[in-house]
A protein has these predicted regions:
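A short, glycine- and basic residue-enriched loop/turn
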Residues: 98, 115-116, 137
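Beta-rich strand-turn-strand
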Residues: 56-60, 109-122, 128-132
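Conserved catalytic-core motifs of eukaryotic protein kinase domains, centered on the activation segment
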Residues: 81-82, 88-90, 150-151
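Glycine-rich NAD(P)-binding loop of Rossmann-like domains
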Residues: 38, 90-100
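Short-chain dehydrogenase/reductase
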Residues: 105, 123, 139-141
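Glycine-rich, phosphate-binding/catalytic loops in enzymes
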Residues: 94, 140, 156-158
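Domain-scale signature associated with acetyltransferase and cell-envelope carbohydrate enzymes
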Residues: 1-78, 101-103, 120, 136, ...
């Protein structure tokens, strides 16, 4: 990631430890706080979150995102209309805070609109448009988003926070993956790839 592929406009914007932001030149991550009222407007993103390419979060009053929340490519979260319904000259329009609970997963290109609260562990399906509160421990999908399934409360839930909590264990996992991916590599194979590369090298 290059810093210029992440745009932060306005403030305050608070991002917790171990949050990963993935951005590309064609799919920038945009975090915007823009309020017309003095002292209003803030964005809080918890620890261990994941923001994938193209994520946009736009706050006119308040957006609070809990720990271990994952936002897939192109997800959009906003707490404002950004223009008045009848007075289009209003630059922000009506704003109502958005609160997203711990360990929520927001799917590809999903939209979360003003005034919404999403309960912990819930999953928002790809392309969903969330216009009403979503309870905890459910899967919601569609436009407007509706609950399509409840998660099993008896099954243990592992979060990004759990995964990132032990750096030594995490490093060992990555080392194991690297070794598995390179197990068929040989010195002669490397030399051949330099002299006579073939597709798949």
């Amino acid at each position: 990631m290059k810093p210029w592929d992440v745009e932060v406009f306005g403030g305050p914007v608070s991002i917790g430890a171990c949050t990963h932001v993935i951005a590309t030149p064609d799919k920038r991550v945009r975090l915007t706080v823009w309020s017309t009222l003095e002292g209003r407007g803030r964005m809080v993103i918890g620890k261990y979150c994941l923001l994938c390419p193209g994520v946009r979060i736009s706050a006119g009053c308040e957006i609070v995102i809990g720990d271990s929340v994952m936002m897939a490519q192109g997800a959009f979260i906003t707490d404002s209309d950004w223009h008045g319904v009848y007075d289009r000259s209003l630059s922000v329009g009506e704003s109502i805070p958005v609160h997203i609970g711990r360990n929520v997963w927001i799917g590809d290109s999903a939209i979360v609109t003003k005034g919404v609260a999403i309960g912990e562990n819930s999953i928002i399906g790809a392309g969903a448009v969330v216009v009403r509160d979503i309870p905890p421990n459910v899967i919601a999908a569609g436009n407007p988003a509706a609950v399509v399934r409840e998660l099993d409360p008896d099954r243990p839930m592992k979060t990004r926070g759990d995964w990132l909590a032990d750096p030594k264990e995490l490093a060992a996992q990555f080392e194991e993956i690297d070794l598995d991916r390179m197990k068929n590599n040989t010195w002669l194979g490397w030399l051949r790839s330099l002299i006579h590369p073939v597709k798949g090298d």
